Amino acid sequence: LLSELMAKAGGRVLGIDAGHAQISVATLHARDAGVTLEYEQATAEQLRDRNNDPFDLVTCMELLEHVPDPFSVVRACAELLHPGGKVIFSTINRSLGAWLKTIVAAEHVLGLLPKGTHRYENFIRPAELATWGRATNLRVLDITGVDYRPMTKTFYLVPEPRANYMMCLARPTADD
């Protein structure tokens, strides 16, 4: 859905996912919505290894906490950017609040997600993500928390990254 929104806003968009079924569903959804964009079955690392056309923007939403080597994904995303390009990661903080909201409430109490979707030890503290970014020559531009209201089914931004959060990082230019 994010890929479709970016394409509707005028972006030339390539959406990737490692799963064939997810790519098939996304392709059909975009076609039915009349949105023009490309989808490929690939991981960030696979795309990086075969891509010769750097991106202005890479988004990696709600993935890092589900992969065995999140630093590898951060590095691949950094290497997909041209100088001055930005990457936005969305993930979950390893905190008590995140555990209560994501695992206890969303998975066990409200049933918004299947039980076992998340593992607390795979959540990523903002400082860890920032360190991985710096290790791949990215600089942190912004970080903001994201919260969810189950009664209205709406997401909203909050100042502190207590549970879900987004971090925007940039690849420096020659002038930086």
Predicted segments — roles?
Residues F71-K86:
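A short glycine-rich, Lys/Arg-flanked "PGG" loop and its adjoining helix->strand segment in the class I
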Residues D32-L47:
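Conserved SAM-binding strand-loop segment of SAM-dependent methyltransferases
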Residues G19-A21:
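Conserved SAM/SAH-binding beta-strand->alpha-helix loop
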Residues T91, H108-E128:
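Acceptor-substrate binding/catalytic loop of class I
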Residues Y120-I143:
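Short alpha-helix
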Residues K86-L110:
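Conserved class I S-adenosyl-L-methionine
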Residues L1-G10:
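Conserved SAM-binding loop of SAM-dependent methyltransferases across substrates and taxa
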Residues E45-V58:
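A short acidic, Gly/Pro-enriched loop at the edge of an enzyme's catalytic core
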